[in-house]
Amino acid sequence: NINDIKDFGHNYRLVSESKKALFTIFHQKNLIFPPHLRFSLQCKDLLYNYIPITTILDPMISNDHYEIIETLATFMLDADFEVKRAAEIMYVHRNTILYRIKKANILLDQDISSWPFCHELYSAIAVWRLKNNI
């Protein structure tokens, strides 16, 4: 089918353009889908166009709470918002993950599960991870 070939070619180009960003942001993912590719390209654009999306992380950065940012990155990007999976990836107890999420809510003065803040935070965390690993 010609459409399958076009889709394959399009997805191959997406992977080629976003491979480094993709595996930096989603380094624990075993399965990658086209939305992951598109999101990685968006984050790459945000990073290289100096769009200040990571400023929402400033309350955690200014207080040296990098373990909370790493926990949020693992929880949101790697574990798909699953506390148990995040705890397994980080080799900590699930209550540690819950404590750090609660601490993030306090530091950010927002509920990280509320929409649209959750989407903004997800993007900021991804760009932060990309920025700190390139």
Residue ranges and their predicted role:
Residues 1-134:
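Cytosolic nucleotide-utilizing catalytic cores of signal-transduction proteins
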